[in-house]
Protein backbone atom coordinates (compact mmCIF):
# COMPACT_ATOMS: atom_id res chain seq x y z
CA UNK A 1 0.00 0.00 0.00
CA UNK A 2 1.38 3.43 -0.95
CA UNK A 3 0.45 6.74 0.59
CA UNK A 4 0.97 10.31 -0.53
CA UNK A 5 3.63 12.15 1.43
CA UNK A 6 2.00 15.32 2.70
CA UNK A 7 4.26 17.51 4.80
CA UNK A 8 3.53 20.62 6.86
CA UNK A 9 6.69 22.29 5.54
CA UNK A 10 8.73 24.44 7.91
CA UNK A 11 9.52 28.08 7.31
CA UNK A 12 13.10 28.38 6.08
CA UNK A 13 15.86 30.05 8.08
CA UNK A 14 13.94 30.13 11.37
CA UNK A 15 15.43 28.83 14.63
CA UNK A 16 12.23 27.01 15.62
CA UNK A 17 9.49 25.13 13.80
CA UNK A 18 6.60 27.07 12.34
CA UNK A 19 4.73 26.32 9.11
CA UNK A 20 5.87 28.08 5.95
CA UNK A 21 3.57 30.83 4.69
CA UNK A 22 3.28 30.51 0.91
CA UNK A 23 2.12 32.89 -0.36
CA UNK A 24 2.53 35.37 2.52
CA UNK A 25 -0.43 36.71 4.45
CA UNK A 26 -1.60 39.91 2.81
CA UNK A 27 -1.36 38.48 -0.70
CA UNK A 28 -4.38 39.14 -2.91
CA UNK A 29 -5.49 35.77 -4.29
CA UNK A 30 -8.89 36.62 -5.79
CA UNK A 31 -10.15 39.88 -7.25
CA UNK A 32 -8.23 43.00 -8.19
CA UNK A 33 -7.58 46.16 -6.20
CA UNK A 34 -4.66 48.56 -6.19
CA UNK A 35 -4.61 48.56 -2.37
CA UNK A 36 -3.75 44.87 -2.34
CA UNK A 37 -1.35 44.92 -5.27
CA UNK A 38 2.37 44.45 -4.49
CA UNK A 39 4.81 47.34 -4.15
CA UNK A 40 8.55 46.93 -4.72
CA UNK A 41 11.01 49.38 -3.13
CA UNK A 42 14.66 48.72 -3.98
CA UNK A 43 15.21 45.05 -3.17
CA UNK A 44 12.08 44.48 -1.11
CA UNK A 45 8.62 43.56 -2.39
CA UNK A 46 5.67 44.24 -0.10
CA UNK A 47 2.58 42.08 -0.78
CA UNK A 48 0.19 45.02 -0.51
CA UNK A 49 0.04 48.78 0.10
CA UNK A 50 -1.68 48.80 3.49
CA UNK A 51 1.06 49.38 6.06
CA UNK A 52 1.02 49.29 9.86
CA UNK A 53 2.07 52.75 11.08
CA UNK A 54 4.43 53.02 14.06
CA UNK A 55 2.55 52.91 17.37
CA UNK A 56 4.39 53.75 20.59
CA UNK A 57 3.60 51.19 23.29
CA UNK A 58 5.38 52.84 26.27
CA UNK A 59 6.10 49.35 27.58
CA UNK A 60 9.90 48.94 27.64
CA UNK A 61 12.40 49.08 30.48
CA UNK A 62 15.72 50.75 29.67
CA UNK A 63 14.87 50.63 25.97
CA UNK A 64 14.56 46.83 25.72
CA UNK A 65 11.78 45.19 23.70
CA UNK A 66 9.82 42.46 25.48
CA UNK A 67 6.89 40.09 24.98
CA UNK A 68 4.38 42.94 24.78
CA UNK A 69 6.15 44.27 21.69
CA UNK A 70 6.31 40.77 20.19
CA UNK A 71 2.62 40.07 20.67
CA UNK A 72 1.55 43.57 19.60
CA UNK A 73 3.38 43.30 16.29
CA UNK A 74 2.99 39.53 15.98
CA UNK A 75 -0.78 39.44 16.03
CA UNK A 76 -0.90 42.00 13.24
CA UNK A 77 1.80 40.54 10.96
CA UNK A 78 0.07 37.14 11.05
CA UNK A 79 -2.77 38.86 9.21
CA UNK A 80 -0.72 40.49 6.48
CA UNK A 81 0.02 44.22 6.42
CA UNK A 82 2.26 45.07 3.49
CA UNK A 83 4.85 46.42 5.94
CA UNK A 84 4.74 46.60 9.74
CA UNK A 85 6.76 49.50 11.16
CA UNK A 86 7.82 49.24 14.78
CA UNK A 87 7.34 52.22 17.04
CA UNK A 88 9.55 55.28 17.50
CA UNK A 89 12.82 53.83 18.79
CA UNK A 90 15.29 56.25 20.32
CA UNK A 91 18.78 56.75 18.90
CA UNK A 92 19.94 58.30 22.20
CA UNK A 93 18.86 57.57 25.76
CA UNK A 94 17.72 61.18 26.24
CA UNK A 95 15.81 60.92 22.97
CA UNK A 96 13.09 58.64 24.34
CA UNK A 97 9.64 60.17 24.56
CA UNK A 98 9.03 58.46 27.90
CA UNK A 99 11.21 56.34 30.22
CA UNK A 100 9.36 53.32 28.80
CA UNK A 101 10.21 53.87 25.12
CA UNK A 102 12.21 51.47 22.97
CA UNK A 103 15.84 52.25 22.19
CA UNK A 104 18.57 51.27 19.76
CA UNK A 105 21.31 53.32 21.39
CA UNK A 106 23.05 50.24 22.79
CA UNK A 107 24.15 46.94 21.26
CA UNK A 108 22.20 45.13 23.99
CA UNK A 109 18.95 46.26 22.39
CA UNK A 110 19.59 44.18 19.27
CA UNK A 111 18.82 40.65 20.52
CA UNK A 112 15.29 41.33 21.87
CA UNK A 113 14.44 43.02 18.57
CA UNK A 114 15.85 40.07 16.59
CA UNK A 115 13.27 37.87 18.31
CA UNK A 116 10.55 40.09 16.84
CA UNK A 117 12.04 40.28 13.35
CA UNK A 118 12.54 36.51 13.32
CA UNK A 119 8.86 36.02 14.09
CA UNK A 120 7.88 38.43 11.31
CA UNK A 121 10.17 36.62 8.88
CA UNK A 122 8.79 33.25 10.00
CA UNK A 123 5.49 34.56 8.63
CA UNK A 124 7.16 35.72 5.38
CA UNK A 125 6.34 39.29 6.47
CA UNK A 126 8.29 42.53 6.10
CA UNK A 127 9.08 44.58 9.19
CA UNK A 128 10.62 48.02 9.56
CA UNK A 129 11.62 50.22 12.47
CA UNK A 130 11.25 53.95 13.04
CA UNK A 131 14.37 55.65 14.43
CA UNK A 132 13.60 58.75 16.44
CA UNK A 133 14.65 61.42 18.92
CA UNK A 134 12.03 63.28 20.93
CA UNK A 135 14.08 66.43 21.53
CA UNK A 136 12.16 68.91 23.71
CA UNK A 137 9.21 66.49 23.93
CA UNK A 138 11.34 63.89 25.75
CA UNK A 139 11.00 62.80 29.38
CA UNK A 140 7.20 62.72 29.16
CA UNK A 141 4.90 60.28 30.92
CA UNK A 142 2.80 57.70 29.08
CA UNK A 143 -0.12 59.50 27.42
CA UNK A 144 -2.78 57.56 29.30
CA UNK A 145 -1.37 59.09 32.52
CA UNK A 146 -1.30 62.66 31.23
CA UNK A 147 -1.52 64.43 27.91
CA UNK A 148 1.39 66.76 28.63
CA UNK A 149 3.06 66.06 32.01
CA UNK A 150 6.80 65.47 32.24
CA UNK A 151 8.39 62.43 33.87
CA UNK A 152 10.43 63.59 36.86
CA UNK A 153 13.69 62.04 38.03
CA UNK A 154 11.91 59.97 40.69
CA UNK A 155 10.19 57.92 37.97
CA UNK A 156 13.17 57.68 35.65
CA UNK A 157 12.72 60.96 33.79
CA UNK A 158 15.43 63.41 32.75
CA UNK A 159 13.72 66.84 32.71
CA UNK A 160 17.04 68.64 33.18
CA UNK A 161 18.66 66.92 30.19
CA UNK A 162 16.19 67.36 27.33
CA UNK A 163 17.64 68.98 24.21
CA UNK A 164 16.37 70.97 21.25
CA UNK A 165 17.52 73.30 18.45
CA UNK A 166 16.63 76.31 20.61
CA UNK A 167 15.81 77.03 24.26
CA UNK A 168 12.05 77.05 23.68
CA UNK A 169 9.85 74.64 25.67
CA UNK A 170 7.11 72.63 24.00
CA UNK A 171 4.54 74.14 26.34
CA UNK A 172 5.40 77.13 28.53
CA UNK A 173 4.96 76.34 32.22
CA UNK A 174 4.61 72.60 31.59
CA UNK A 175 7.74 71.41 29.79
CA UNK A 176 11.26 72.22 30.92
CA UNK A 177 13.33 74.65 28.88
CA UNK A 178 15.58 72.41 26.76
CA UNK A 179 19.33 72.65 26.43
CA UNK A 180 20.45 74.00 23.06
CA UNK A 181 22.30 71.46 20.94
CA UNK A 182 25.79 72.68 20.08
CA UNK A 183 27.53 71.99 16.79
CA UNK A 184 29.48 69.24 18.54
CA UNK A 185 26.23 67.77 19.91
CA UNK A 186 24.79 67.68 16.39
CA UNK A 187 27.85 65.81 15.16
CA UNK A 188 27.34 63.21 17.89
CA UNK A 189 23.63 63.01 17.08
CA UNK A 190 24.30 62.24 13.42
CA UNK A 191 26.79 59.55 14.39
CA UNK A 192 24.33 58.03 16.88
CA UNK A 193 21.59 57.95 14.24
CA UNK A 194 23.89 56.07 11.89
CA UNK A 195 24.92 53.66 14.66
CA UNK A 196 21.27 52.97 15.47
CA UNK A 197 20.65 52.27 11.78
CA UNK A 198 23.52 49.78 11.74
CA UNK A 199 22.00 48.07 14.78
CA UNK A 200 18.65 47.92 12.99
CA UNK A 201 20.37 46.12 10.11
CA UNK A 202 21.98 43.69 12.58
CA UNK A 203 18.54 43.12 14.12
CA UNK A 204 17.36 42.03 10.64
CA UNK A 205 14.82 44.74 9.91
CA UNK A 206 13.74 45.03 6.28
CA UNK A 207 13.30 48.82 6.21
CA UNK A 208 14.16 51.90 8.25
CA UNK A 209 12.06 55.01 8.79
CA UNK A 210 13.53 58.28 10.10
CA UNK A 211 11.05 60.18 12.28
CA UNK A 212 10.98 63.88 11.36
CA UNK A 213 7.36 64.58 12.28
CA UNK A 214 4.95 65.25 15.15
CA UNK A 215 7.04 67.88 16.88
CA UNK A 216 9.97 65.61 17.71
CA UNK A 217 13.59 66.67 17.34
CA UNK A 218 14.03 66.70 13.56
CA UNK A 219 10.68 68.44 13.11
CA UNK A 220 11.86 70.94 15.74
CA UNK A 221 14.76 71.80 13.44
CA UNK A 222 12.47 72.07 10.40
CA UNK A 223 9.95 74.46 11.92
CA UNK A 224 10.63 78.16 12.61
CA UNK A 225 8.22 77.79 15.54
CA UNK A 226 10.87 75.84 17.45
CA UNK A 227 14.09 76.67 15.60
CA UNK A 228 15.53 80.14 16.28
CA UNK A 229 19.15 79.23 15.63
CA UNK A 230 21.51 81.62 13.88
CA UNK A 231 24.09 79.06 12.75
CA UNK A 232 24.02 76.79 9.69
CA UNK A 233 21.16 74.76 11.21
CA UNK A 234 18.72 77.65 11.60
CA UNK A 235 17.15 80.60 9.83
CA UNK A 236 16.67 79.88 6.14
CA UNK A 237 14.80 76.88 4.75
CA UNK A 238 18.10 75.44 3.52
CA UNK A 239 19.59 75.66 7.00
CA UNK A 240 16.58 74.27 8.84
CA UNK A 241 16.40 71.16 6.64
CA UNK A 242 20.16 70.61 6.75
CA UNK A 243 20.30 68.25 9.74
CA UNK A 244 17.60 65.96 8.35
CA UNK A 245 19.33 65.75 4.98
CA UNK A 246 22.67 65.03 6.65
CA UNK A 247 21.14 62.29 8.80
CA UNK A 248 19.53 60.73 5.73
CA UNK A 249 22.91 60.70 4.00
CA UNK A 250 24.59 59.17 7.07
CA UNK A 251 21.95 56.45 7.37
CA UNK A 252 21.82 55.66 3.64
CA UNK A 253 25.61 55.22 3.68
CA UNK A 254 25.57 52.52 6.39
CA UNK A 255 22.58 50.41 5.36
CA UNK A 256 22.39 47.93 2.47
CA UNK A 257 21.70 49.37 -0.97
CA UNK A 258 18.66 47.09 -1.25
CA UNK A 259 17.11 48.34 2.02
CA UNK A 260 14.27 50.87 1.71
CA UNK A 261 14.70 54.16 3.57
CA UNK A 262 11.56 56.02 4.63
CA UNK A 263 11.11 59.42 6.27
CA UNK A 264 8.01 60.53 8.18
CA UNK A 265 7.29 64.25 8.03
CA UNK A 266 4.59 66.57 9.27
CA UNK A 267 3.44 68.27 6.07
CA UNK A 268 2.36 71.35 8.02
CA UNK A 269 2.24 72.80 11.52
CA UNK A 270 -1.40 73.73 10.63
CA UNK A 271 -0.88 77.37 11.63
CA UNK A 272 -0.96 78.44 7.97
CA UNK A 273 -4.69 77.62 7.83
CA UNK A 274 -5.81 79.67 10.86
CA UNK A 275 -5.73 83.47 10.70
CA UNK A 276 -5.37 83.94 14.46
CA UNK A 277 -2.58 81.38 14.73
CA UNK A 278 -0.85 82.85 11.68
CA UNK A 279 -0.71 86.17 13.53
CA UNK A 280 0.77 84.43 16.59
CA UNK A 281 3.12 82.25 14.52
CA UNK A 282 3.86 84.23 11.34
CA UNK A 283 6.56 81.71 10.41
CA UNK A 284 5.86 78.00 10.63
CA UNK A 285 6.38 74.76 8.70
CA UNK A 286 4.11 74.65 5.65
CA UNK A 287 2.99 72.33 2.86
CA UNK A 288 5.00 74.36 0.35
CA UNK A 289 8.17 73.75 2.36
CA UNK A 290 7.34 70.04 2.65
CA UNK A 291 7.18 69.81 -1.14
CA UNK A 292 10.64 71.39 -1.40
CA UNK A 293 11.95 69.05 1.30
CA UNK A 294 10.53 65.94 -0.38
CA UNK A 295 12.46 66.65 -3.57
CA UNK A 296 15.67 67.08 -1.57
CA UNK A 297 15.05 63.83 0.32
CA UNK A 298 14.74 61.95 -2.96
CA UNK A 299 18.20 63.20 -3.91
CA UNK A 300 19.59 61.80 -0.63
CA UNK A 301 18.50 58.23 -1.26
CA UNK A 302 15.16 58.35 0.53
CA UNK A 303 12.64 56.05 -1.14
CA UNK A 304 9.34 56.95 0.49
CA UNK A 305 8.04 59.94 2.44
CA UNK A 306 5.33 59.13 4.95
CA UNK A 307 3.13 62.24 5.19
CA UNK A 308 1.51 63.14 8.51
CA UNK A 309 1.01 66.56 10.13
CA UNK A 310 1.10 68.67 13.29
CA UNK A 311 2.67 68.18 16.70
CA UNK A 312 5.09 71.11 16.89
CA UNK A 313 3.19 73.08 19.54
CA UNK A 314 0.33 72.58 21.97
CA UNK A 315 -1.79 74.87 19.79
CA UNK A 316 -1.27 72.76 16.65
CA UNK A 317 -4.15 70.54 17.71
CA UNK A 318 -6.50 73.52 17.81
CA UNK A 319 -6.05 74.13 14.10
CA UNK A 320 -6.39 70.54 12.86
CA UNK A 321 -9.57 69.86 10.89
CA UNK A 322 -10.12 66.23 11.80
CA UNK A 323 -12.28 63.73 9.93
CA UNK A 324 -11.89 60.72 7.61
CA UNK A 325 -8.59 61.02 5.76
CA UNK A 326 -8.15 64.50 7.23
CA UNK A 327 -4.55 64.90 6.07
CA UNK A 328 -4.55 62.78 2.92
CA UNK A 329 -4.77 65.89 0.74
CA UNK A 330 -1.33 66.95 1.98
CA UNK A 331 0.14 63.66 0.74
CA UNK A 332 -1.66 64.16 -2.57
CA UNK A 333 -0.23 67.67 -2.99
CA UNK A 334 3.28 66.39 -2.33
CA UNK A 335 2.84 63.40 -4.67
CA UNK A 336 1.61 65.68 -7.44
CA UNK A 337 4.80 67.74 -7.09
CA UNK A 338 7.32 64.89 -6.86
CA UNK A 339 5.72 62.51 -9.36
CA UNK A 340 7.66 59.30 -9.91
CA UNK A 341 10.79 60.67 -8.26
CA UNK A 342 9.61 59.62 -4.81
CA UNK A 343 7.06 57.26 -3.28
CA UNK A 344 4.50 58.84 -0.95
CA UNK A 345 2.31 57.25 1.72
CA UNK A 346 -0.69 58.78 3.47
CA UNK A 347 -1.83 58.24 7.05
CA UNK A 348 -4.54 59.52 9.37
CA UNK A 349 -8.22 58.68 9.60
CA UNK A 350 -8.13 56.01 6.89
CA UNK A 351 -10.81 53.88 8.50
CA UNK A 352 -12.37 52.00 5.58
CA UNK A 353 -11.24 49.87 2.70
CA UNK A 354 -13.11 52.10 0.28
CA UNK A 355 -11.22 55.18 1.45
CA UNK A 356 -7.88 53.34 1.39
CA UNK A 357 -8.51 52.17 -2.18
CA UNK A 358 -9.61 55.66 -3.22
CA UNK A 359 -6.38 57.12 -1.81
CA UNK A 360 -4.07 54.74 -3.68
CA UNK A 361 -6.14 55.09 -6.85
CA UNK A 362 -5.49 58.85 -6.61
CA UNK A 363 -1.77 58.23 -7.08
CA UNK A 364 -0.59 57.74 -3.49
CA UNK A 365 1.74 54.73 -3.36
CA UNK A 366 0.71 53.29 0.03
CA UNK A 367 -1.52 54.03 3.00
CA UNK A 368 -0.77 53.54 6.67
CA UNK A 369 -3.13 52.78 9.54
CA UNK A 370 -2.20 52.83 13.19
CA UNK A 371 -4.93 52.87 15.80
CA UNK A 372 -7.30 50.93 13.54
CA UNK A 373 -4.82 48.05 13.39
CA UNK A 374 -4.51 48.19 17.16
CA UNK A 375 -8.30 47.97 17.49
CA UNK A 376 -8.56 45.29 14.80
CA UNK A 377 -5.40 43.28 14.02
CA UNK A 378 -7.36 41.73 11.14
CA UNK A 379 -7.79 45.09 9.41
CA UNK A 380 -6.25 43.78 6.19
CA UNK A 381 -8.92 41.08 5.89
CA UNK A 382 -11.65 43.53 6.95
CA UNK A 383 -10.68 46.00 4.20
CA UNK A 384 -10.41 43.14 1.68
CA UNK A 385 -13.86 41.83 2.58
CA UNK A 386 -15.28 45.33 2.21
CA UNK A 387 -13.71 45.64 -1.25
CA UNK A 388 -14.88 42.19 -2.33
CA UNK A 389 -11.46 40.60 -2.80
CA UNK A 390 -9.78 37.66 -1.10
CA UNK A 391 -6.52 38.24 0.77
CA UNK A 392 -4.63 35.53 2.64
CA UNK A 393 -3.99 35.46 6.37
CA UNK A 394 -1.50 33.12 8.05
CA UNK A 395 -2.32 29.52 7.13
CA UNK A 396 -3.17 28.59 10.73
CA UNK A 397 -5.91 31.25 10.66
CA UNK A 398 -6.85 31.19 6.99
CA UNK A 399 -7.83 27.52 6.72
CA UNK A 400 -10.66 27.92 9.24
CA UNK A 401 -12.30 30.37 6.84
CA UNK A 402 -11.25 28.82 3.53
CA UNK A 403 -11.72 25.16 4.44
CA UNK A 404 -9.61 22.04 4.77
CA UNK A 405 -7.26 20.69 2.13
CA UNK A 406 -8.22 17.94 -0.29
CA UNK A 407 -9.19 14.62 1.27
CA UNK A 408 -6.80 11.74 0.79
CA UNK A 409 -7.89 9.01 -1.61
CA UNK A 410 -8.30 5.46 -0.41
CA UNK A 411 -5.37 3.36 -1.52
CA UNK A 412 -5.73 0.14 -3.49
CA UNK A 413 -4.39 -3.03 -1.91
From Swiss-Prot:
Binding residue positions for substrate: 58, 211-214
Documented EC number(s): 1.6.99.1
Gene3D superfamilies, per database record: Aldolase class I (3.20.20.70)
Induction info: Expression is induced by the developmental and secondary metabolism regulator veA.
Keywords: Flavoprotein, FMN, NADP, Oxidoreductase
Domain of life: Eukaryota
Protein's recorded name: NADPH dehydrogenase afvA
Transmembrane segments: none
Role summary: NADPH dehydrogenase; part of the gene cluster that mediates the biosynthesis of aflavarin, a bicoumarin that exhibits anti-insectan activity against the fungivorous beetle C.hemipterus.
Family matches, as InterPro entries: Aldolase_TIM (IPR013785), OxRdtase_FMN_N (IPR001155), YqjM-like (IPR044152)
CDD domains: OYE_YqiM_FMN
One Pfam family this sequence matches: Oxidored_FMN
Pathway per the UniProt entry: Secondary metabolite biosynthesis
GO MF term list: FMN binding; NADP binding; NADPH dehydrogenase activity
Catalyses which reaction(s): A + NADPH + H(+) = AH2 + NADP(+)
Top class in the EC scheme: oxidoreductase
Phenotype of gene-disrupted mutants: Fails to produce aflavarin.
Family, per entry: Belongs to the NADH:flavin oxidoreductase/NADH oxidase family. NamA subfamily.
Binding site for FMN: 53-56, 88, 130, 264, 370-371
Cofactor(s) needed by this chain: FMN
Amino acid sequence: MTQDIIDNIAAEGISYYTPAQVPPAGTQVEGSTKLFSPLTIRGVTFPNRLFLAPLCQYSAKDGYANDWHLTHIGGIVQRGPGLAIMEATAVQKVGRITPQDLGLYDDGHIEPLKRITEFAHSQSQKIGIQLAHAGRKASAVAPWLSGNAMAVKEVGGWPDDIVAPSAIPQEEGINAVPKVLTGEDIGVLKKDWAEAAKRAVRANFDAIEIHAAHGYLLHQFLSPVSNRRTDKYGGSFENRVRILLEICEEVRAVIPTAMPLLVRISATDWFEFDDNLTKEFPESWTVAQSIRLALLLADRGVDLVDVSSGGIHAKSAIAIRSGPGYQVHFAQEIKKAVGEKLLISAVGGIKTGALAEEVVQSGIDAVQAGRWFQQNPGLVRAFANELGVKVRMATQIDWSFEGRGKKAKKSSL
